[in-house]
Every structure is written in C-alpha cells, then in structure tokens.
C-alpha cells in the first residue's frame, strides 16, 4: 500500500493543534520534526517536546485528495492562506522495522553505552544501559541527554547518591547506578515517567537501588552528592531554590535542557551557590555544571 505525505512548517504553539486537526480529517499518522529534519522521538512525560520551528508531517492513504486536505486546513484558520507545504508520494515499507533501524547503540564518554534491546552490545565489558524508546523523555538521541550522560561518565560516582530531577525515562539515574552510584532517586511530575523509570530500572537490574517519587510526594530534606536536572530553562530558574537545597556541600550539579542562548540567565540563578564550570555546548543546546560552595 502506498501513501501520500504532506509536510508543513508551524510555530511550536500551533503544531499540536494542527496535528489533532489532521488526524481528525484522516491522517493515519502525524509526526513532528525540528528544523534540522531530525524526528522528535523523545516527548516529555505528558506532552510533546517541540523546539524552534516545527515541521508537521502527516501521512495519508495514497487515494486521498490532497488539494481538499490543503483547502480544509486553510478553512480551519490554523494556517495562513498561502502557507508553505510539500506533498510527496511515499513507498510502502515495514515502518516498524524502519523505525527500529534508526536506533543504534551510542557511546557517551569513555565507559558508557546506551543500547536498544534489539541491537547487539558493541562492548560487553563497557557500562551498558539497555533502553528502548518508549513512554518518556530520554533515550540518548537528544543533545541534552547526551550532554548529561557524558558528564555522568566523567564523574567518580562510586558509593555516591544521585538525584535525577525530572527523571523522564530514568536514563540518567540508571546510568549513574551502572556507573557505580550506591543509590539514585528519580523525581518527576508525571506518573508516566515514574512507570517508565521503574520498568527501565528492572530491565537493567538496578531497581533495588532506585527510589522514585512524584514531585508532590518527594520527601522533605532530600540531599545527594550529585544532582542532575535535564528539564527546561524556565523550570530550572523557577525551581533553583529547591534544586540548590538537594545538593550536598561540595556536591556536583549538572543542568541541561537549556538552549545556548539561555545559558547566562540560568547561570545567574545558581552562581551564588556554585562554582560553575565552563559551559559545554552541543548543537544549539548546552550543559551547565558546578560544585556547591557550602
């Protein structure tokens, strides 16, 4: 069976509305792509992660009247009358296999690998985290996750306690445990993330050393040797007082989910409490790390 695809550019704000509308008028699937044509496979728990200008890509049955689809979109007022779009025919494929083929084992730092379950482990002697794309944000494919994993690999986590603030899939907490941490604590606002983290921890044999809490249920006076938060710049600034208290004196802090253009404002929220390192950038994203002063 052949398909026809329409691709149109949208603002972040309107992308989900357009997606819902396209599904209502017959799209068999709708995906989001960023401006670099990279599929966004990693939704935050409870929402769709979008950044920059977003392309909405919808797949229809090949017999669909695409002129009518375009006309209906215009009438919906979700797009401008002269909105740019591209329509192309798509050959039939084994889409599940195509999707799986896009994921490969990835190395972070010197020791750490993230491996999909259907791939052969490249180095059995390395620190291997088995993780499949699934319920929650975090598989290693996004630059912010990569920045955080590389940082964790650089630390001596032996017998340390690590807090993963905004744990998503649990990838960072699980990686920390596999890298030698004694205990990890994952905190997230969404129950979906807690479920995903628990499942992934069980697959990796570290569930007995991982505690998980919804934000509203987290214990008072939590504190750790290492705190990592891969969320977004806004929450990192708003929640700075809370995040700062989670780090022991002389403990390590790692922050990401931050665009390079937002780094300065995030640093200002933490610089009085931490001796901050040089900012590390990857593509348009960055990582902020530091050691707590007291």
UniProtKB/Swiss-Prot annotation:
Keyword Cell inner membrane: no
Chief place where the protein resides: cytoplasm
Subcellular location: Cytoplasm
EC number: 2.1.1.-
UniProt key word Repeat: no
Residues involved in S-adenosyl-L-methionine binding: 145, 166, 188, 230
SUPFAM superfamilies the UniProt entry points to: S-adenosyl-L-methionine-dependent methyltransferases
InterPro entries, A to Z: Ribosomal_L11_MeTrfase_PrmA, Ribosomal_PrmA_MeTrfase, SAM-dependent_MTases_sf
Pfam families recorded: PrmA (PF06325)
Assigned GO CC terms: cytosol
Assigned protein family: Belongs to the methyltransferase superfamily. PrmA family.
Name listed for the protein in its UniProt record: Ribosomal protein L11 methyltransferase
Taxonomic lineage of the native organism: Bacteria, Pseudomonadati, Pseudomonadota, Gammaproteobacteria, Pasteurellales
């Amino acid at each position: 069976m052949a398909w026809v695809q329409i691709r149109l550019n949208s603002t972040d704000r309107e992308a989900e509305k357009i997606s819902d509308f396209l599904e209502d008028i017959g799209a068999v699937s709708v995906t989001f792509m960023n401006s670099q044509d990279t599929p966004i496979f990693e939704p935050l728990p409870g929402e769709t992660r979008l950044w920059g200008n977003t392309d909405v890509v919808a797949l229809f049955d090949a017999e669909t009247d695409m002129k009518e689809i375009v006309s209906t979109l215009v009438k919906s007022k979700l797009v401008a009358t002269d909105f740019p779009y591209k329509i192309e025919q798509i050959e039939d494929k084994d889409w599940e296999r195509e999707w799986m083929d896009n994921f490969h084992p990835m190395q972070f730092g010197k020791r750490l690998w993230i491996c999909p379950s259907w791939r052969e482990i490249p180095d059995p002697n390395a620190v291997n985290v088995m993780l499949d794309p699934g319920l929650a944000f975090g598989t290693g494919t996004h630059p912010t996750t990569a920045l955080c994993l590389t940082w964790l690999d650089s630390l001596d986590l032996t017998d340390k306690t690590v807090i993963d603030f905004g744990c998503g899939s649990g990838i960072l907490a699980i990686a920390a445990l596999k890298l030698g941490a004694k205990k990890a604590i994952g905190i997230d606002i969404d129950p979906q993330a807690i479920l995903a983290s628990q499942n992934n921890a069980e697959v990796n044999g570290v569930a007995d050393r991982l505690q998980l809490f919804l934000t509203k249920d987290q214990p008072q006076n939590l504190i750790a040797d290492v705190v990592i938060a891969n969320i977004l710049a806004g929450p990192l600034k708003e929640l700075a007082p809370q995040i700062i208290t989670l780090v022991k004196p002389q403990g390590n802090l790692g922050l990401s989910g931050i665009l390079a253009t937002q780094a300065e404002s995030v640093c200002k929220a933490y610089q009085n409490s931490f001796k901050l390192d040089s900012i590390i950038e990857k593509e348009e994203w960055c990582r902020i790390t530091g050691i707590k002063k007291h």
